[in-house]
Amino acid sequence: MTDQNRLARQVAALADAHVLVVGDLMLDRFVLGSVDRISPEAPIPVFQIKNQRPMPGGASNVATNVVALGGTATLIGVTGDDEAGQVLTSLLGDQPRLVARTVVDATRPTSVKTRYVAQGQQVLRVDSEQRHAIGADVTAQLLQMIDAALPEVGALVLSDYGKGVLTPDVLRRIIDKAAARNISVVVDPYGRDFARYKQAGYI
């Protein structure tokens, strides 16, 4: 069997798959416009906004990709108690075959990456986020949601962007819970310390 045939069969199998995605939720904002002059105030381009488009990012994007390939996704993560979190939740609610279960943490903002694009090129990216580890109460709520979701799924994807949700303790406990149920674990890793993902099936 060729690699292309094997990939085609794996993609087709996603039509019957229910995947749990856990990780760092983000809102991607794309600000589309044009640059046709330099500011008289400083040697910087003047960006003229024409359109803006929000999209699910981070682990949220992984879950929407699972759905796009024909699967069913349950997404678990953390948002802030803010407008960006509400926008992201609304976007995810519009996705068929995707259930988003989020813990709202009032102590941190929803991670937002805003990209300014002109003439097909990124001009600037602005990040609004905090990267500290989630607290004990949020961790407990997160693990409770994961416990409830694991019996329903056939695979687990850990989407780690280093934003403080998948702490070493959370990773260890999630991977152990999945292993106890013989659930395949796939990791989209952050950094080079792959020991954090010990016992995961695929990194």
Regions found by a protein language model. Give the residues of each.
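Divalent-cation-assisted or electrostatically stabilized phosphate/pyrophosphate-binding catalytic cores
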Residues: 43, 47-50
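Ribokinase/PfkB-type carbohydrate-kinase core domain
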Residues: 1-36, 51-203
